[in-house]
Amino acid sequence: MLHTLTRSLRENKGPALVTVLLSALEVVFEIVIPLFMSNLIDFGIEGGSMAAVWKFGAFLLLLAAFQLATGVLAARIAARASVGFAANLREDMFDNVQTFAFSNIDKFSTASIVTRLTTDTTNVQNAFQMLMRMAIRAPVMLIFSMIVSFRISHDISMTFLIILPILALALFFIIRSVFPVFSRVFRTYDELNNVVQENVRGIRVVKSFNQEQHEIGKFGAISERIYKDFSKGERLITLNAPLMQFCIYTCMIVISWLGAKAIIASGNDPALGLTTGNLTALITYTMQILSSLMMLSMVFAMLTISLSSARRIAEVLEEQSDIPQPEQPVMTVRDGAVDFDHVSFVYASKADKKVLDDIDLHIRSGETIGIIGGTGASKSSLVQLIPRLYDVTGGKLTLGGVDVRDYDLDTLRGAVAMVLQKNELFSGTIAENLLWGNENATDEQLRHACELACADGFISAMPDGYDTHIEQGGTNVSGGQKQRLCIARALLKKPKVLILDDSTSAVDTRTDAQIQQALSTYIPDTTKIIIAQRISSVQNADRIVVLDDGHIDAVGCHDELLRTCEIYREVYESQQKGGEDDA
């Protein structure tokens, strides 16, 4: 995990190292200051020498200025390095998500990925910034303050050896108790984000069914769980502060008492024992030792909170796409011939059940294939294998005579245009959305593609035409308009294979027929695979495939299937009857 995260440091390694060095230098100045303060008291104030006061006072001011300068500089560089590190983490996670196959995406919910890109990354950023500063300052200050303290008075400094184990033990139990609590908190954040996303995305459904209070209750229940767990974790962490304060004041009292006895015994003579200046330095070092322990406890507390976040980020960064690039990829797709050679497929999450079994289907280049089947017949699963959104788990699938696993992924997906069941438009103008199909398309090409998809009419009727702004998710266009825009976008790719996955379900039958006629007339060399619920959408196809529970039940033209396929005939008759009833 650590190696995975540190790869994202990149250009921030230098600033991080400089921060560490500056923090160490800051501690050196801080350690030296009490020694000069001791000399100022012993030789200046107690010795009655103003020259010594001026001399050591000047050194103290100079050291304090250097300490301030190094501290401020270290803090600024640490902030810049931590922000850069967080930016790299987000970029690396987002880039890796773009390489995921659908099977990889299935492992992470959308809300979980959003949480990892935001909350988890911020937690790691804060921990990294604290690590660069406190994780260096605290141990260096602790070690050197202990060394100097023992040099001043071995006997009095033994007090630390009693206090330190108590603090270490308490800190161990606090961290061990806190870690599982915060791990649970960040998992619950995923649930909370998921509820928010679902509610915002489906707000029209929520309002139409009067389910606002139900959604508020669902959100409140998860929010309450986060509140309780976070409160529990914070309560455990806050035990650290009073414990540290108790130890600090106990040490101060014990050291002051022992120091006073030693000064009285020595007569404040440095040759005979402890002096007032030594005791002042010792008390200052005591504060430094205990404050360094407090800093360490804060570091451990922050690391405890961020460790869960770091692991969740590492999970995304370490996830390897289930669709690997071939070592020597084929860079050209010859034509749109698609051959399923006894193909089978299972989803990783449901490995015990075959979604597709022994699919043997051979599609000629330029042929129009219709696919009909009931819900759960695996129609979408079948066509998603062609652009390698998933890989076959048995048999062989070829495009243009080449196994799809041998193609360069960009080449393969560039040759296959797919309009999915869930059509997605992005924030921007209509033209910008269409250019996803071909970023170099001219205005004439955009208009021609929209004419084929029967979209040019409603676009031209809009006040801003092709410059009309599309809201997030395409909420300001109807379902049928969205489908036609997505078909036009796919046509701009000029693909070898065009897949329409129930992509005209929201348009009327007349418009559907116009789209099918346009596709047949204007792109005859493109292989067209049309999944539909309405038989009218596919009845003019060269061949129609009837899928039933992941198996091919029948293949043939419309008239042939009416005679030989019971499933097809039942669907056709029910739709015909439904059409008559509607009439």
Residue ranges and their predicted role:
Residues 21-22, 29-42, 63-110, 114, ...:
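Juxtamembrane helix-loop junctions of ABC transporter transmembrane domains
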Residues 1-30, 37, 45-56, 66, ...:
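Membrane-integrated ABC transporters
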Residues 11-13, 99-103, 119-132, 136, ...:
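An intracellular "coupling" helix at the cytosolic face of ABC transporter transmembrane type-1 domains
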Residues 11, 15-27, 59-60, 69, ...:
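Transmembrane helices of ABC transporter permease
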Residues 93, 97, 206, 313, ...:
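Helix-loop junctions and hydrophobic alpha-helical segments within the transmembrane domains
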Residues 331-583:
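ABC-type nucleotide-binding domain
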Residues 97, 219, 313, 340-342:
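Conserved catalytic Walker-motif region of ABC-type ATPase nucleotide-binding domains
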